[in-house]
Amino acid sequence: MSTTTEVVAHHWAFAVFLIVSIGLCCLMLAGAWFLGGKARGRHTNTPFESGIASVGTAKLRLSAKFYLVAMFFVIFDVEALYLYAWSTAIRESGWVGFVEAAIFILVLLAGLFYLVRIGALDWAPARRQFDVKPTTISHANRQKP
């Protein structure tokens, strides 16, 4: 059991830390405001790239494929962290841990094969389901103008 003085000392230290942290942040913001540049020209906030005036907008619409690849990366990266944690404790986990990790890897591979199967990782245009043969019009069936 901790005594009341230890609890108060612990909370007092946290309060001092919090006050000093907030004070330091305010000091840095105030210093930047006082020491920062005060240029207020007409073209101050316009973008400038190598002396060439920009044309158009900087807002580009990206394909959803970029977001999908980013989500897949995050998902599989988190699983890599789990495998790293397992690898550090492999001796303590024994064969049971090995079997669990093997099942975990198999589930990851099944997910990866599913993503490949549905074409989520394909950057090329959609594949054709069947070949379309070009039709030929015979000269006898052609209408004359």
From Swiss-Prot:
Whether Cell inner membrane counts among this entry's keywords is yes
Q: What EC number(s) does this enzyme carry?
A: 7.1.1.-
Bilayer topology annotation: Multi-pass membrane protein
Question: Where, per UniProt, does this protein localize?
Answer: Cell inner membrane
- Tell me the keywords, alphabetical order: Cell inner membrane, Cell membrane, Membrane, NAD, Quinone, Translocase, Transmembrane, Transmembrane helix, Transport, Ubiquinone
User: Where are its TM segments located?
Assistant: 14-34, 66-86, 96-116
Q: What range does the record give for the signal peptide?
A: none
**Pfam families attached here?**
Oxidored_q4
Which GO MF terms does the UniProt record name?
NADH dehydrogenase (ubiquinone) activity; NADH:ubiquinone reductase (non-electrogenic) activity; quinone binding
State the GO CC annotations: NADH dehydrogenase complex; plasma membrane
Q: Which InterPro entries match?
A: NAD(P)H_OxRDtase_bac/plastid, NADH_UbQ/plastoQ_OxRdtase_su3, NDAH_ubi_oxred_su3_sf
UniProt lists the family membership as follows: Belongs to the complex I subunit 3 family.
How the protein assembles, per its UniProt entry?
Answer: NDH-1 is composed of 13 different subunits. Subunits NuoA, H, J, K, L, M, N constitute the membrane sector of the complex.
Q: What does this protein do?
A: NDH-1 shuttles electrons from NADH, via FMN and iron-sulfur (Fe-S) centers, to quinones in the respiratory chain. The immediate electron acceptor for the enzyme in this species is believed to be ubiquinone. Couples the redox reaction to proton translocation (for every two electrons transferred, four hydrogen ions are translocated across the cytoplasmic membrane), and thus conserves the redox energy in a proton gradient.
Q: What is this protein called?
A: NADH-quinone oxidoreductase subunit A
Which lineage do the record's taxonomy fields give for this organism?
Bacteria, Pseudomonadati, Pseudomonadota, Gammaproteobacteria, Enterobacterales
Which gene carries the instructions for this protein?
A: nuoA
